[in-house]
Protein backbone atom coordinates (compact mmCIF):
# COMPACT_ATOMS: atom_id res chain seq x y z
CA UNK A 1 0.00 0.00 0.00
CA UNK A 2 0.98 3.66 -0.21
CA UNK A 3 2.14 3.86 3.40
CA UNK A 4 4.43 0.86 2.97
CA UNK A 5 5.85 2.33 -0.23
CA UNK A 6 6.66 5.60 1.48
CA UNK A 7 8.23 3.94 4.53
CA UNK A 8 10.38 1.69 2.32
CA UNK A 9 11.40 4.61 0.17
CA UNK A 10 12.38 6.67 3.19
CA UNK A 11 14.57 3.89 4.59
CA UNK A 12 16.44 3.56 1.30
CA UNK A 13 16.81 7.32 0.89
CA UNK A 14 18.03 7.79 4.46
CA UNK A 15 20.73 5.15 4.00
CA UNK A 16 21.70 6.74 0.71
CA UNK A 17 21.87 10.21 2.20
CA UNK A 18 23.86 9.06 5.24
CA UNK A 19 26.57 8.04 2.81
CA UNK A 20 26.54 11.51 1.30
CA UNK A 21 26.63 13.19 4.70
CA UNK A 22 29.60 11.04 5.71
CA UNK A 23 31.80 12.35 2.87
CA UNK A 24 31.12 16.06 3.37
CA UNK A 25 32.22 18.44 6.10
CA UNK A 26 29.62 21.07 5.23
CA UNK A 27 26.51 21.74 7.31
CA UNK A 28 24.48 21.58 4.10
CA UNK A 29 24.45 18.57 1.77
CA UNK A 30 22.94 18.66 -1.70
CA UNK A 31 20.24 16.12 -2.56
CA UNK A 32 20.94 14.44 -5.94
CA UNK A 33 18.48 15.07 -8.77
CA UNK A 34 17.55 11.38 -9.04
CA UNK A 35 16.62 11.30 -5.36
CA UNK A 36 14.35 14.32 -5.79
CA UNK A 37 12.73 12.75 -8.86
CA UNK A 38 12.06 9.52 -6.95
CA UNK A 39 10.66 11.42 -3.97
CA UNK A 40 8.29 13.41 -6.18
CA UNK A 41 7.13 10.17 -7.82
CA UNK A 42 6.32 8.61 -4.43
CA UNK A 43 4.50 11.75 -3.34
CA UNK A 44 2.32 11.65 -6.46
CA UNK A 45 1.36 8.06 -5.64
CA UNK A 46 0.30 9.32 -2.21
CA UNK A 47 -1.98 11.97 -3.71
CA UNK A 48 0.34 14.98 -3.61
CA UNK A 49 1.28 17.21 -6.53
CA UNK A 50 4.55 19.11 -6.21
CA UNK A 51 6.75 21.02 -8.64
CA UNK A 52 10.42 20.20 -8.76
CA UNK A 53 11.20 23.89 -8.48
CA UNK A 54 9.90 24.10 -4.90
CA UNK A 55 11.16 20.72 -3.63
CA UNK A 56 13.97 21.36 -1.06
CA UNK A 57 17.32 20.60 -2.65
CA UNK A 58 19.46 20.01 0.44
CA UNK A 59 19.84 18.44 3.85
CA UNK A 60 20.61 21.07 6.48
CA UNK A 61 21.96 20.70 10.01
CA UNK A 62 20.34 23.27 12.31
CA UNK A 63 20.56 23.76 16.07
CA UNK A 64 17.53 23.89 18.33
CA UNK A 65 17.12 27.00 20.50
CA UNK A 66 16.09 27.24 24.14
CA UNK A 67 14.35 30.42 25.30
CA UNK A 68 11.76 32.12 27.50
CA UNK A 69 9.09 34.59 26.37
CA UNK A 70 8.51 38.09 27.65
CA UNK A 71 5.68 37.99 30.19
CA UNK A 72 3.12 40.75 30.80
CA UNK A 73 5.23 41.82 33.79
CA UNK A 74 8.34 41.94 31.59
CA UNK A 75 6.56 44.16 29.05
CA UNK A 76 5.35 46.50 31.76
CA UNK A 77 8.81 46.81 33.30
CA UNK A 78 10.47 47.39 29.92
CA UNK A 79 8.09 50.17 28.90
CA UNK A 80 7.33 51.91 32.17
CA UNK A 81 9.94 50.77 34.69
CA UNK A 82 7.14 49.57 36.96
CA UNK A 83 4.15 47.25 36.98
CA UNK A 84 1.32 48.74 34.90
CA UNK A 85 -1.79 46.88 33.81
CA UNK A 86 -2.30 47.19 30.05
CA UNK A 87 -5.90 47.88 29.10
CA UNK A 88 -7.94 44.91 27.88
CA UNK A 89 -8.32 44.99 24.12
CA UNK A 90 -11.48 46.82 23.06
CA UNK A 91 -13.81 44.41 21.28
CA UNK A 92 -14.48 47.13 18.70
CA UNK A 93 -10.92 46.84 17.40
CA UNK A 94 -11.50 44.94 14.19
CA UNK A 95 -9.06 44.40 11.35
CA UNK A 96 -10.12 46.17 8.18
CA UNK A 97 -9.74 44.78 4.68
CA UNK A 98 -6.11 44.78 3.62
CA UNK A 99 -4.90 45.16 7.18
CA UNK A 100 -3.43 42.29 9.19
CA UNK A 101 -2.60 44.44 12.19
CA UNK A 102 -5.13 42.82 14.51
CA UNK A 103 -4.72 39.28 13.22
CA UNK A 104 -1.81 37.23 14.48
CA UNK A 105 0.07 35.93 11.44
CA UNK A 106 3.28 33.92 11.36
CA UNK A 107 6.54 35.81 11.75
CA UNK A 108 5.09 39.32 11.87
CA UNK A 109 5.26 42.32 14.13
CA UNK A 110 1.68 43.57 14.23
CA UNK A 111 0.42 47.06 14.90
CA UNK A 112 -3.05 48.46 15.32
CA UNK A 113 -4.71 51.78 16.12
CA UNK A 114 -8.46 51.37 16.38
CA UNK A 115 -9.39 49.70 13.12
CA UNK A 116 -6.70 51.52 11.13
CA UNK A 117 -3.19 50.27 10.49
CA UNK A 118 -0.34 52.29 11.92
CA UNK A 119 1.87 53.74 9.16
CA UNK A 120 5.08 51.96 8.25
CA UNK A 121 7.07 54.89 9.61
CA UNK A 122 5.30 54.73 12.96
CA UNK A 123 5.80 50.97 13.06
CA UNK A 124 9.52 51.42 12.50
CA UNK A 125 9.70 53.98 15.32
CA UNK A 126 7.95 51.54 17.64
CA UNK A 127 10.51 48.86 16.87
CA UNK A 128 13.34 51.29 17.62
CA UNK A 129 11.61 51.91 20.95
CA UNK A 130 11.47 48.17 21.60
CA UNK A 131 15.22 47.91 21.02
CA UNK A 132 15.92 50.79 23.39
CA UNK A 133 13.71 49.13 26.00
CA UNK A 134 15.83 46.00 25.89
CA UNK A 135 14.00 43.66 23.52
CA UNK A 136 16.23 41.13 21.77
CA UNK A 137 15.73 42.22 18.15
CA UNK A 138 18.50 40.17 16.54
CA UNK A 139 17.37 38.90 13.17
CA UNK A 140 14.38 41.24 12.89
CA UNK A 141 13.84 42.16 9.23
CA UNK A 142 11.65 45.04 8.09
CA UNK A 143 9.53 44.50 4.99
CA UNK A 144 8.91 48.05 3.72
CA UNK A 145 6.41 46.97 1.10
CA UNK A 146 4.28 44.94 3.52
CA UNK A 147 4.80 47.31 6.45
CA UNK A 148 5.75 44.73 9.06
CA UNK A 149 8.76 43.05 10.63
CA UNK A 150 9.44 39.33 10.81
CA UNK A 151 11.98 37.32 12.77
CA UNK A 152 14.95 35.41 11.36
CA UNK A 153 17.72 33.46 13.10
CA UNK A 154 20.68 32.24 11.05
CA UNK A 155 18.67 32.93 7.91
CA UNK A 156 15.69 30.82 9.04
CA UNK A 157 12.21 31.91 10.17
CA UNK A 158 10.94 31.48 13.72
CA UNK A 159 7.28 30.56 13.19
CA UNK A 160 4.44 32.19 15.15
CA UNK A 161 6.44 35.09 16.59
CA UNK A 162 4.70 38.44 16.90
CA UNK A 163 4.43 41.69 18.82
CA UNK A 164 1.04 43.39 18.64
CA UNK A 165 0.61 47.01 19.69
CA UNK A 166 -2.50 49.21 19.67
CA UNK A 167 -2.47 52.98 20.15
CA UNK A 168 -5.12 55.23 21.65
CA UNK A 169 -6.25 58.56 20.14
CA UNK A 170 -3.27 60.31 21.74
CA UNK A 171 -0.82 57.91 20.13
CA UNK A 172 -0.02 56.20 23.43
CA UNK A 173 0.23 52.44 23.78
CA UNK A 174 -3.06 51.20 25.21
CA UNK A 175 -2.76 47.50 24.38
CA UNK A 176 0.21 45.24 23.92
CA UNK A 177 0.57 41.52 23.40
CA UNK A 178 3.72 39.63 22.53
CA UNK A 179 4.99 36.16 21.81
CA UNK A 180 8.60 37.07 21.37
CA UNK A 181 11.64 35.22 22.68
CA UNK A 182 14.27 36.57 25.01
CA UNK A 183 17.86 35.72 24.14
CA UNK A 184 18.06 32.34 22.38
CA UNK A 185 20.53 29.73 23.61
CA UNK A 186 21.71 27.18 21.05
CA UNK A 187 20.89 23.57 21.80
CA UNK A 188 21.44 20.27 20.04
CA UNK A 189 22.09 20.42 16.30
CA UNK A 190 19.70 18.35 14.20
CA UNK A 191 19.95 17.29 10.56
CA UNK A 192 16.64 17.95 8.84
CA UNK A 193 15.44 17.10 5.35
CA UNK A 194 12.06 17.26 3.70
CA UNK A 195 12.42 13.67 2.47
CA UNK A 196 12.53 12.47 6.08
CA UNK A 197 9.36 14.46 6.81
CA UNK A 198 7.40 12.98 3.89
CA UNK A 199 5.98 10.20 6.06
CA UNK A 200 4.11 12.89 8.02
CA UNK A 201 2.38 14.36 4.96
CA UNK A 202 -0.56 11.96 4.87
CA UNK A 203 -1.49 12.36 8.56
CA UNK A 204 -1.22 16.14 8.20
CA UNK A 205 -3.08 16.29 4.87
CA UNK A 206 -5.21 13.10 4.59
CA UNK A 207 -6.83 14.22 1.32
CA UNK A 208 -3.53 15.04 -0.40
CA UNK A 209 -3.47 18.00 -2.78
CA UNK A 210 -1.11 20.44 -4.49
CA UNK A 211 1.91 21.47 -2.44
CA UNK A 212 2.26 25.21 -3.06
CA UNK A 213 5.04 26.10 -0.64
CA UNK A 214 7.67 24.46 1.56
CA UNK A 215 9.61 26.61 4.02
CA UNK A 216 12.25 25.58 6.53
CA UNK A 217 11.98 27.21 9.93
CA UNK A 218 11.42 26.59 13.63
CA UNK A 219 8.36 25.36 15.48
CA UNK A 220 7.75 25.95 19.16
CA UNK A 221 7.57 23.35 21.92
CA UNK A 222 7.01 23.80 25.63
CA UNK A 223 9.93 22.57 27.72
CA UNK A 224 7.97 22.92 30.96
CA UNK A 225 7.11 25.99 33.01
CA UNK A 226 8.18 29.20 31.29
CA UNK A 227 10.85 27.49 29.18
CA UNK A 228 10.43 26.76 25.48
CA UNK A 229 12.40 25.16 22.67
CA UNK A 230 12.47 26.06 18.97
CA UNK A 231 13.04 22.93 16.88
CA UNK A 232 13.81 22.79 13.13
CA UNK A 233 10.62 22.10 11.16
CA UNK A 234 9.01 22.39 7.75
CA UNK A 235 6.07 24.74 7.15
CA UNK A 236 4.09 23.17 4.30
CA UNK A 237 1.16 24.62 2.37
CA UNK A 238 -1.11 22.15 0.56
CA UNK A 239 -3.84 23.95 -1.38
CA UNK A 240 -5.12 26.48 1.20
CA UNK A 241 -4.04 24.58 4.32
CA UNK A 242 -0.79 25.12 6.21
CA UNK A 243 0.78 22.62 8.61
CA UNK A 244 4.12 22.42 10.39
CA UNK A 245 5.93 19.08 10.07
CA UNK A 246 8.52 18.47 12.77
Task: Label each region the model flagged.
Residues 1-137:
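Preferential activation on post-signal-peptide N-terminal prodomains/segments
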Residues 86-113, 147, 151-184, 237-246:
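Amphipathic N-proximal alpha-helical interface segments
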Residues 185-246:
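Extracytoplasmic/luminal low-complexity segments enriched in Pro/Gly and acidic/polar residues
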Residues 33, 162-163, 188-191:
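Surface-exposed beta-strand edges and their flanking turn/coil or helix-capping segments
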Residues 9, 163, 234:
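Residue-level detector of short, conserved catalytic/binding motifs and their immediate flanks
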Residues 119-154, 159, 209-213:
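Acidic, serine/threonine- and glycine-rich low-complexity intrinsically disordered segments
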Residues 71-93, 141-156, 216-225:
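A cross-family detector of function-defining hotspots
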Residues 129, 133, 165-168, 204:
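Structured segments of extracytoplasmic/periplasmic soluble domains
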Amino acid sequence: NIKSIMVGFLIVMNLFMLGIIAVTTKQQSIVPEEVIDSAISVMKESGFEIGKDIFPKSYVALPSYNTQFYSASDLSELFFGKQVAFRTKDKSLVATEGSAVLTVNNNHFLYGSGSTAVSSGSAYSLVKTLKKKGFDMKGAVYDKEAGYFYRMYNGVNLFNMFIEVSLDSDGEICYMKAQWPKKLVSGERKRISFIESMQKLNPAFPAGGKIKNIELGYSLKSAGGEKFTFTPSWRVQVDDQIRILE
